[in-house]
Design a protein with these regions (language model features):
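Hydrophobic residues positioned within well-ordered beta-strands of beta-sheet architectures
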Residues: 8-10, 76, 94, 119, ...
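Short, surface-exposed beta-strand/loop "edge" segments at domain boundaries and coil↔beta transitions
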Residues: 80-92, 115-119
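Beta-strand/loop substructures that line and gate deep hydrophobic ligand-binding cavities in soluble
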Residues: 97-158
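Short beta-strand segments that buttress and anchor functional surface loops
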Residues: 75-85, 106-112
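Hydrophobic ligand-binding cavity/cleft-lining segments
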Residues: 1-73
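Short, highly charged C-terminal tails/helix-capping segments
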Residues: 166-178
């Protein structure tokens, strides 16, 4: 009753000459993926315990996990600005769950206050048979309190270009360093 859902989708063209497999491999590099988060101040691997549900892709997302690629989890600390100009910053600790899919990665982020973001990051072909090139697609479903949905959605909408740019820059760098 007090929970709301929002969908957000961001698409960035992948420059010509970058193979799809290279872009997919980048998305499946979980630690690099985390490092693209502009708010991240710390992260560490978090093994699954017997009481944790095994991360999986929810039904209805039209993607399947890669067989033989076990899910990976991390605990990530983000520094979030609660007031402008850094007058009041807050560290938010979230659990990131990564499930590799054929053309990218599914990421579930579980944050405090019941905020859950489920994202499919894929490399897709543009046009008929990919004739128009490739694109990086970020498709997010946000679920949280109605009171927070606008703030969470705004945060997703405000920083996506920088994240995508960092990924594209990494793909274009011939020696593979960020």
């Amino acid at each position: 009753m007090f929970t709301s859902t929002a969908n957000v989708k961001h698409v960035t063209p992948i420059p010509a000459g970058i193979p799809a497999l290279k872009a997919i491999s980048l998305l499946q590099g979980h630690e690099f993926f985390i490092k693209c988060d502009p708010h991240m101040v710390h992260y560490e691997a978090s093994p699954l315990s017997d009481k944790d549900p095994v991360p999986s892709v929810p039904a209805g997302r039209d993607v399947q996990p890669v067989v033989g690629a076990p899910p990976k989890c991390f605990v990530v600390t983000d520094r979030v600005h609660a007031l402008p100009a850094g007058l009041w910053d807050s560290d938010v600790v979230s659990r990131y769950e990564f499930v590799d899919i054929a053309r990218g990665v599914f990421v579930r982020i579980r944050s405090p206050l019941g905020v859950v973001m489920e994202s499919v990051w894929e490399v897709r072909e543009k046009g008929e048979g990919g004739a128009a090139g490739l694109e990086l697609v970020e498709d997010i479903v946000i679920t949280c309190s109605r009171l927070l949905i606008g703030t969470v959605k705004s945060t997703c909408d405000s920083g996506w270009q920088g994240i995508h740019l960092k990924m594209i820059d990494h793909l274009q760098n011939a020696d593979g360093r960020a």
